[in-house]
Amino acid sequence: MGMDLALKAKLQKQRYHIVGEHGGVKVCHWTKESLLRDRQCYKGKFYGIASHNCMQTSPVVDQCNLACTYCWREPHMDTLELTDQDPLELLYESVRAQRRLLSGFGGNPKVPREKWLDAQNPKHVAISLNGEPTLYRRLGEYIDLCHKHGMTTMLVTNGTFPKVLERLDPLPTQLYVSVDAPNKEIFDKVCKPKWNSRAWEQFEKTIDLLPSLDTRIVARHTLMKGIN
């Protein structure tokens, strides 16, 4: 089952580059800031990651099992019938897409030529652009390929698929879990599971699992006054 054509056109208008049937790449704001103004995101300060070397991507840019109230992205998931795109194809096509998206910066006098050339070969892959990446059944293979190509990986998940994280091999360089509610009532109100009434219970299992995962872990909060 491929991407909805209306959604695909909308994402492309928003400067997403669609990769395969469900993948996507979009240049991060901080990648642009690094090239144009030598500014870095928090990853630069905390982990020494150069923003111009970071590729923002997702293997399932159009698919998520939640419809969070704060999310500006458009959820478009009704089933779990996803195409398992070849991980090598996904990675190579994502890098090609990143290069195309950065091509215009090469002629900008504000962008140092050496830095722009360096950005053509991403060193860090942020699997966080859109959708829920743990829905991609070959995620472990994809992460493994990134690591074998000398790239670090940062995986952002809503934490509702603990079995995927438990079996994930290898683990990402850094794992981010969205923690947006203290209990089921608020979770259901804020995160709005689309078809899984046990999403909160699954999320709790992920929280219990985290101490056993041998990688850097970050709890990511989106706070809304008076709501969560």
Residue ranges and their predicted role:
Residues 1-70, 74-100:
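Flexible, acidic/Gly-rich N-terminal and inter-domain linker regions that tether
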Residues 108-228:
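Conserved AdoMet/S-adenosylmethionine-binding subsite of the radical SAM
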Residues 89-119:
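Short Fe-S-cluster ligation motifs
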